[in-house]
Structures are given as C-alpha cells and as structure tokens.
Amino acid sequence: MGVFSFVCKSKGGEWTAKQHEGDLEASASSTYDLQRKLVQTALSADSSGGVQSSFSLVSPTSAVFVVVIGGGGGGGFAAGGGAAAGGGGGGEAAAATKEEEKKKEESEEEEGDFGFDLFG
C-alpha cells in the first residue's frame, strides 16, 4: 500500500504540486487536471491496487492532495436512517416519551440540589 501526500499551490493561474516527502511533482492549469496527473504519477511509482484520493483546499491558492494506492477494502459508506413507524398509536408513544423525559429532568434536578445557594 502506498500513500502519497502532495502540497498544491496556485500561482498565476497554474497549479503545481510537490510530494510532501519525496520527489514526485506535477503541474496543470486546473485542480481537476492536477489531480488526474498526480494520480497517474503516483500509479507510476506504485501500481499495487485500487486508488483512493482526497483533495482539500486549505486556502483559495493552496491545497493538500492525498493518493492512497492498494490497501484492500473499498471503504464502503453506509448511511442508515431509521424509518419512522407509521400507523395509529403514535400519540400515546409520544406522550409516554414526554413523561419519561419529565421524570428524568426531575431526578436530575434533585441530584444537583445540595441545600445551599452558591451565588447568594
């Protein structure tokens, strides 16, 4: 697995990138083209597997680009949202929840009451 970190800078409409710890570099007229060139440059140094990359602007004229080659897993992203239960009885459940919250708040208030006024 290879990890390639690049520091990217824009000057005069041209983006340049130099590897943070290494000799790889590239330049292009846009960040899109620069990213494509950097991925190809990294692949020429290490072609051991799949490619993941991340481009982050630090300021309007500087950025960090990281290319990860290999590493196995494809980093799946799973976003699960609980579906709301439909049907009758929703009002009763909401009322029960409010009662539980009220009891919890009352017990928290009782826990913090030590019988003296700190600011009085």
Curated annotation (Swiss-Prot):
Gly residues composition bias: residue spans: 81-92
Pfam families linked: Ribosomal_60s (PF00428)
Gene Ontology molecular-function annotations: structural constituent of ribosome
Annotated spans, Disordered: 81-120
Compositionally biased intervals (Basic and acidic residues): 97-106
InterPro entries: Ribosomal_P1/P2, RPP3
Domain of life: Eukaryota
Record's protein name: Large ribosomal subunit protein P3y
